[in-house]
Amino acid sequence: MKFAIPVIIVVLVAGGYAVNYFTGTVNAQPGECLTVSEFSKTADEPTRVDCGSQEANVKIGARVDGDAACPDGDYDTISMSGRMSYKLCLTVNAKQGDCLSGFLSDTAGYKKVACTDPAKDAELVKVTDTVDKAVCEGTEARYAQSYSTPPTTLCIKADK
């Protein structure tokens, strides 16, 4: 019994590390997607998810060390500190025709919703693989967001 408790502790610690390794951001790379519930210092750590899932609200555009700047663009950012300090430069993970709630919030994570949902506050009316906000001219978009890595421009119609 004396040896059982240390073994259980080691198993629990190793299990927790493995869960964080495979679902946390410590090894997250550009092109992978995350669920971010809130953009604040007190929010839960993002979770890696399949980019095709409904919960995948952001995609990692770039990962930079420490306090380095993100590439040119309108990235949301999450900074992680500790043994490994890094910043994730995040793009909205949505396609043309998708609707979102939380887009107009300063801290809420985006949530993909039905375009008929009363919580909807934004709709992506055009998405291109270029970095040119001028592509949004002539659309219903009130906001244009562009990212240099990967090259993307989002034309967003906001409801409020």
Where in the sequence are the language-model features?
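Glycine-rich ThDP/TPP pyrophosphate-binding loop and its adjacent helix/strand module
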Residues: 8-11
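Primary mode marks residue(s) on the alpha4-beta5-alpha5 output face of response regulator receiver
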Residues: 2-5, 15-160
